[in-house]
């Protein structure tokens, strides 16, 4: 682990010393404590594959206060959230249970849209922003979404995906801390190592859209009035023949204004300085908007507005993330670059989860130099090339060493992941990791096995447009959700959560102690220079009382 790596060789580096570290029985024991959680966004659609105009069903509870079933940008955009637990099977069982519960409580005829790219969309004026009621916290969430709509348009916000939350246990970090002979205090070491992980994910993150991208096509209504040159499969479907993920491309989720303020992941300090600047710097593009049209006129209204494929995260309901991370560090990462795979009932499966865990563990252990401006540009270029042309034969990707064949760039990483998989399976008496790597390696050997290729193949062979095929998958999965069963205890628990969340929202609405303008004025205040943890807790005490939201981080808007 003490080998030095220079930026010039990082993209092809194979560091065998990490294999020695993870092969230890003690380290294998700690890895049983890896926690993961999944958040899946999906649109509610009508039998004719139109965006639902109905409100979020009350039978699902309050979108404001329910811990597992909420909404994202739109009233018709569900978000299902599993708690972070150590058991992978438990995570997927919970995710399946949430799908079943939602399916049984949707308005008649509605289903959950299986794809990341939305179906045929109405005009922006006919897309309803999520409604969170009349409490101050609820109205703030709605004002934030008004800001998103006015800044980026509503259609972009309706792109859905999967967020994968991942944390390594403290005993693992303690062993790595000793192994690397780090002079940093343990808590600082953990935070910096999460940024270390993030940098490696950024470097090698192009493999995510290649392997798991599932949005090579979109309904024509999404690109209405946008100057992008896509091919037409038919009069309703735009696509790119070699694309893996339009969602992750420049025509998907992104912000030109944010690109003017690139935030560094070279250290916790660099990240927080950049984030604070974006939260306090008046935006050239958005300052003209009226107060009621957004939370504020900064480049970022809130931390959550920061777009990117991966984020450092901390859960602390007592203070906003900027301050909490400043004083308590990073607790976990959120991988945000996963498309909903419409070929899978849950949009993701356990083998994919095992591969992602391996990739993230590799990223935490492999050398990770700072990312220069030059390398950051190359990372963005690789991402765009793979998102729009990833399956193109003999595609060359730019690196610090010049252009490299995509499959050649993948080889050292996949070889090392295969070795890690053997060690992990041996230590945990399974064979899932090796199966996961073999399945993904096959996609590099044969690009037709990627989900993006499979989707386009079905469209072309069966002469189906995007919306028709995705509606077919959605209906098929809906029948599967309905045929699943929950135990009486599970169903009762979910029904009680829904009921209690509605009560909690009413209590919040009855407890407004100040007018909304005063509430927002407090929310706009950011102190980026709090000198101590005690001062941070004291300064944020009032903030905490105002913004606690569903026992989640106060800023989860």
Where are these regions (language model features)?
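Extended, compositionally biased alpha-helical segments that mediate assembly or anchoring
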Residues: 429-557
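Short conserved micro-motifs at the rims of enzyme active sites and ligand-binding pockets
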Residues: 53-56, 92, 125-126, 176-177, ...
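A glycine-rich phosphate-binding loop feature that marks nucleotide/adenosyl-phosphate handling sites
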Residues: 118-120, 218-222, 376-386, 433-443
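Substrate-recognition/cap regions that form aromatic- and gly/pro-loop-enriched pockets
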Residues: 326-328, 333-421
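Generic recognition of stable, solvent-exposed alpha-helical segments in well-folded globular domains
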Residues: 37, 93, 97, 139, ...
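Terminal catalytic/cofactor-binding subdomain
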Residues: 2-149, 156-162, 189-192, 196
